């Protein structure tokens, strides 16, 4: 059980906004509304399908390695933007015992880091997917040193995503950040998405598996972005 009061405090939003979150999550059949709060419909308080977290995900170990490498790029006391997705969640797991400022539009990330020594700022107002990703007000006053994104796919020109709303939201933080890092797992090389997040020239670093296709390795080798293989 989590109370509306506690969830409102964690997210730093108004009670009415929390009510909208819970209503949407109930519509997605992720929670059950009860008096004063909500209960999970799964065994853990997850806004995502069980495979989102568990090692029955065929790319689980790869995501763990990608998240570990990404966390190594974050210095203590830095302010970073963390987008949504499983790869980002594995990065967030490595930050539980750190002390940094996190700006995120991911409900799973914000709840994972709540109660730690990290300062967590949740941006966005409306959950638009069963992964608990928020869009809406990005808070133009927030400045970040680094932005970490997990694109849904790649093509010859850059990183893409399936949702235009998510793309437009992440573009704001890509423009704000002094450094942008993309985290890419093997699955993303096999997928296509209609909306472009940014070109390869717009990122400063790319973290990807050693199993990445040779043609993409060649693209990154000829690009200004630092490439990290795991």
Q: Which residues are covered by each model-predicted region?
A:
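HTH-adjacent hinge/linker in prokaryotic transcriptional regulators
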Residues: 1-5, 9-81, 92-101, 113-118
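Conserved phosphate- and dinucleotide-binding cores of soluble alpha/beta proteins
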Residues: 3-5, 12, 27, 33, ...
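Short, active-site-adjacent cap segments at secondary-structure transitions
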Residues: 39-40, 88-90, 110, 155-156
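Short, well-ordered beta-to-alpha junction loops that form the rim of enzyme active sites
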Residues: 84-86
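Residue-level recognition of conserved structural "scaffold" positions that shape functional pockets
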Residues: 90-92, 131
């Amino acid at each position: 059980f989590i109370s509306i009061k506690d969830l409102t405090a964690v997210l730093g939003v108004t009670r009415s906004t929390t009510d909208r979150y819970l209503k949407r999550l109930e519509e997605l059949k992720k929670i059950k509304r009860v008096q004063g709060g909500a209960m999970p419909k799964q065994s853990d308080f997850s806004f995502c399908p069980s495979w989102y977290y568990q090692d029955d995900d065929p790319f689980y170990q790869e995501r763990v390695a990608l998240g570990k490498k990404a966390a190594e790029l974050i210095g203590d006391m830095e302010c970073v933007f963390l987008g949504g997705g499983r790869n980002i969640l594995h990065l967030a797991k490595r930050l539980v015992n750190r002390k940094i400022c996190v700006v995120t539009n991911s409900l799973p990330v914000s709840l994972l880091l709540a109660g730690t020594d990290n300062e967590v700022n949740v941006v966005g107002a409306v959950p638009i997917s069963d992964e608990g990703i928020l869009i809406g007000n990005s808070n133009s006053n927030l400045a970040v040193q680094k932005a970490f994104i997990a694109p849904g796919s790649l093509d010859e020109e850059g990183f893409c995503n399936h949702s235009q709303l998510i793309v437009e939201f992440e573009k704001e933080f890509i423009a704000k950040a002094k450094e942008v890092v993309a985290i890419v797992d093997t699955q993303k090389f096999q997928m296509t998405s209609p909306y472009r997040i940014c070109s390869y020239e717009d990122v400063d670093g790319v973290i990807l598996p050693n199993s990445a296709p040779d043609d993409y390795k060649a693209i990154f080798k000829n690009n200004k972005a630092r490439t990290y293989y795991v």
